[in-house]
Amino acid sequence: MLTINSIKNGIVIDHIKAGHGIKIYNYLKLGEAEFPTALIMNAISKKNKAKDIIKIENVMDLDLAVLGFLDPNITVNIIEDEKIRQKIQLKLPSEVNNIIKCSNPRCVTSVESYIPHKFKLVDEEKGEYKCEYCDEIYKGAKALEI
C-alpha cells in the first residue's frame, strides 16, 4: 500500500472522479507551480471504488467556482497545522465568467474580444449553461474539453 504524507498548510481537493484528477491538475496549471503539489490517482474511496486527490501545499488562493464547474462533487479541505479546518462541498456555480468561451460565430464575444464571456446556469441537473449574449447552451465542463 502506498503511503501519502499529510500537508501542514494548504488545500486538499478530494473526491475527484477517478481519472479526472490529471485534467483538473493540468487545467489549474499545477505542473508549472513553484510550490509543492501532489496528484494521487485511483485512491481507495469509501463512496466509490476509486477517486483522485490533489494536494497543494501553502496555497489558499483557489477559484472554487471553477472547481465546482469542473466537478461539482469535489470536496475542498482547507488544512492548517496538519488538521482539516474547513470542508467545502462544491456545487455548480450559478454563473461563470471567462471560463467557457462562446463558440457561436454570431455572438458578440466572437467579434468584440474585450467583452467577458458570461454564462448563467439554466439546468442544474443537466449542468447546462446559457450564454448571456446569444443564448447558446453549453453542457458543464464538457465545454472546456477537459
Curated annotation (Swiss-Prot):
A GO biological-process term: pyrimidine nucleotide biosynthetic process
Cofactor(s) needed by this chain: Zn(2+)
Gene3D superfamilies on file: Aspartate carbamoyltransferase regulatory subunit, C-terminal domain, Aspartate carbamoyltransferase regulatory subunit, N-terminal domain
Binding site for Zn(2+): 102, 107, 131, 134
Keywords: Metal-binding, Pyrimidine biosynthesis, Zinc
A UniProt-annotated Pfam family: PyrI
Transmembrane stretches, start-end: none
Disulfide cysteine pairs (residue numbers): none
Entry's cofactor comment: Binds 1 zinc ion per subunit.
GO cellular component term of the entry, any: aspartate carbamoyltransferase complex
Molecular function as annotated in GO: metal ion binding
Annotated family: Belongs to the PyrI family.
Cited function: Involved in allosteric regulation of aspartate carbamoyltransferase.
Record note on quaternary structure: Contains catalytic and regulatory chains.
The protein's name: Aspartate carbamoyltransferase regulatory chain
Lineage: Bacteria, Bacillati, Bacillota, Clostridia, Eubacteriales
Name of encoding gene: pyrI
